[in-house]
Amino acid sequence: MRTRLLAVVAGVGLLLATTSAWAHHAFAAEFDQNKPIKVRGAVVKWELTNPHSWIHIDVKGDDGKAVTWMIEGASPNNLYRLGFTKESLPPGTEILVEGYQAKDGSTRAVGRNITFSDGKKLFLGLSEAETGPGK
């Protein structure tokens, strides 16, 4: 009986851990595929942290004032495999980011592609399944 109870408790614990991990990586939990964005601005900061990287860019608003957007990207390891280096996004670099805005309407988004001022384009490492179909 005790072994059976231990097995059930372990199974429930494993199920809860799996559900948490899945929810963490669910695009639809945070971002809206019906809110595609294109924002152009200057890099303020690039955080190469796990499990996701963050690019902070200043985008000029309609009133001419800078608004900081936080763009989520793949893990540093994935970005390096896609052609990024630690020197790819120094502060001041002008970029265009395509992605999807947060469901709460904040200036936060998941990025799909970055285009540099010279026309070079890099993929931010999130699959089509994560960022919406056909985007």
Q: What are the residue ranges of the model-derived segments?
A:
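Sec/Tat signal peptide C-region and signal peptidase I cleavage site
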Residues: 19-23
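Short nucleic-acid-contacting surface segments enriched for D/E, G, S/T with interspersed K/R
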Residues: 80-97
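OB-fold/S1-family single-stranded nucleic acid-binding modules
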Residues: 102-126
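Bacterial N-terminal signal peptides
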Residues: 8-18
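Bacterial N-terminal signal peptides that target proteins for export
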Residues: 1-9
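Short, structured beta-strand/loop micro-motifs enriched in basic residues and often containing a Trp
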Residues: 72-81
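Conserved hydrophobic positions within beta-strands
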Residues: 39-43
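Short aromatic-glycine-enriched beta-strand elements
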Residues: 49-60
